[in-house]
Structures are given as structure tokens and as C-alpha cells.
């Protein structure tokens, strides 16, 4: 069972692992959140999907923090029900807020729990789960303290991305400069504000250029306004 959700940084590496396991003849089941992109992205694949109701806490304000213990308890109970029904041999937590309830459910069911951290600085969920995990994997060396005994594996990459990386990159000094602004799967508000202003100041130096700005589905209009201003 793969437990991951929230953003593409957790979901797409999980899909890469699921694809490789499928090629090896190993069945997978995905446990995610109804509010994360996995509800759309994983649902569009052949991976069986179960969803629990839980959101991240960092941007929820004091009310969400106040109700957090109840929300986490309910999500853990739901994850436990799914775990008992699916009966996975191993649970792989790839991060995101849903990994907390999923990891605890795996521990309660006495299932081997493997967690993978994609970032140089581990998130809160993986820091907590590292205390009960059977094996801890990290993309960057020394992300976890030495006593965790994490194994550095790098980040899983999907085959379609790897194939693009091996292709020759054709560039030309002629024509306008092409700039890609990428703020992650959900965008980055700070980039959405700073980059348009910076490009406005640098326009005389850069000359003609084209910008493709990945701003996040929820911030399209405010980013358009920033460029117009």
C-alpha cells in the first residue's frame, strides 16, 4: 500500500514507485486524501484508490488546530478500516498529511512501515513517523539525524520524465528568451508576486522574452493581475 497525498512532490514519486512495482507483478493500493491532488491524478491511473478526509494544518488557522486531534483521530480510524480491508504486506509512506494517519494505522496493524522523504528537510509527518517506521529512506544525504539510520535512495522518477531527460536539448540564441516559472504542483504565491515585478524591472535588459508561468490553479487571476500591473 502506498500512502501519499497533498502535492505533486509526494504523489508523482509515489506513482513512479507504483509503476515499477506493477512491472514487477506486485499489486498496489493507494491511500490518499479527498482534498489532495491524488484524488484527481491517481484516480486517472489504474491504481486502486481509497480516500480519507483530512487536510493540512499549517494554513488552517486556530480553529483547524483546535479541531486537529479529532480530525486526525477520525482519519486514522478510516485508514485503519482500509488497512484491515486491503491487508497490505508493506505500507510505503511518501509524505503529505495523509501519511500520518496511514502510518499510524500501519503501526497499529503491525504492518512493516517504510517512509520516504523527498525533500532535504523532512516534513513534520515524516519526522514523527521516523520514530515508528521499519525503514526510513531519504532523497538527500543526512536529511534525518544519524540515529534514524536512514538510507539515501534519491527520488523516484517516472519513466516518461526519465526519457525526456535523456533526449538532446536543442537550443538557439536566436529569437525571444523563453522563461519557465515553476512553483510546484500548486504554485507558489511568493513567486507569483515577485517574478512579474522583477521581470518588469529587467525588461529593458532582457529585451523580448516569453514567460510560461505555472502559478497554481487557485492563483491564476491574481497572477494575471500581477503581470498586468
Language-model features, listed with the residues they occupy:
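Glycosyltransferases and closely related glycan-assembly transferases
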Residues: 78-92, 99-114, 127-132
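Conserved nucleotide-sugar phosphate-binding/catalytic loop shared by glycosyltransferases and other
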Residues: 2-5, 22-74, 217-219
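Hydrophobic alpha-helical packing residues
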Residues: 21-22, 106, 202
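Short internal beta-strands
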Residues: 27-33, 137-139, 208-216
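Short amphipathic alpha-helix
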Residues: 10-21
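Active-site-proximal region of nucleotide-activated glycan assembly enzymes
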Residues: 27, 37, 48, 107-167
Amino acid at each position: 500500500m502506498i500512502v501519499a497525498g497533498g502535492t505533486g512532490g509526494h504523489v508523482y514519486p509515489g506513482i513512479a514507485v507504483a509503476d515499477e512495482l506493477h512491472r514487477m507483478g506486485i499489486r498496489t493500493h493507494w491511500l490518499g486524501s479527498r482534498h489532495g491532488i491524488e484524488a484527481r491524478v491517481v484516480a486517472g491511473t489504474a491504481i486502486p484508490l481509497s480516500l480519507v478526509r483530512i487536510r493540512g494544518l499549517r494554513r488552517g488557522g486556530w480553529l483547524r488546530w483546535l479541531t486537529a486531534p479529532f480530525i486526525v483521530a477520525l482519519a486514522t480510524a478510516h485508514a485503519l478500516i482500509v488497512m484491515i480491508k486491503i491487508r497490505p504486506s508493506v505500507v510505503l509512506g511518501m509524505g503529505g498529511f495523509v501519511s500520518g494517519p496511514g502510518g499510524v494505522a500501519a503501526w497499529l496493524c503491525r504492518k512493516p512501515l517504510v517512509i520516504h522523504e523527498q525533500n532535504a528537510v523532512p516534513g513534520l509527518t515524516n519526522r514523527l513517523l521516523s520514530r515508528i517506521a521499519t525503514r526510513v529512506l531519504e532523497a538527500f544525504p543526512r536529511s534525518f539525524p544519524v540515529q534514524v539510520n536512514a538510507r539515501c535512495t534519491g527520488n523516484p522518477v517516472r519513466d516518461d520524465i526519465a526519457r525526456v531527460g535523456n533526449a538532446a536539448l536543442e537550443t538557439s540564441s536566436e529569437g525571444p528568451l523563453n522563461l519557465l516559472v515553476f512553483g510546484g504542483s500548486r504554485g507558489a504565491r511568493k513567486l507569483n508576486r515577485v517574478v512579474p515585478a522583477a521581470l518588469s524591472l529587467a525588461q529593458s535588459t532582457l529585451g523580448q522574452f516569453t514567460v510560461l508561468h505555472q502559478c497554481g490553479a487557485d492563483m491564476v487571476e491574481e497572477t494575471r493581475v500581477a503581470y498586468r500591473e
